[in-house]
Amino acid sequence: MDLDDIDMTVQEILTEMKDKSEVIVDLAYASLMYNSRDMVEKVRKIQDEMEDLKYAVRVKVIMAARTKEEAKQLSGILQIATAADRIARSAGDIAQLID
């Protein structure tokens, strides 16, 4: 992924990740309920998007930290991004039950 493609702030990226994590859980559940392979594909697409967003957050946070103290303060942001990514991966695991 090219970071030039993502011109959002870290806050905007985290908000996007939160929104996508909500959608992906709903899609994964619906894919099971309706036995829908189309929904499984949408889950996979969102998973890929979440990976890109997580990467963008990591790079932006690393670039923002100038001192050890700032790095410690920014580590929480990385934990939030990782948590959203875990939600997406777990939803992907649920959707894989269809395959």
Regions found by a protein language model. Name each.
Residues 1-99:
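Cytosolic, long alpha-helical scaffolding segments
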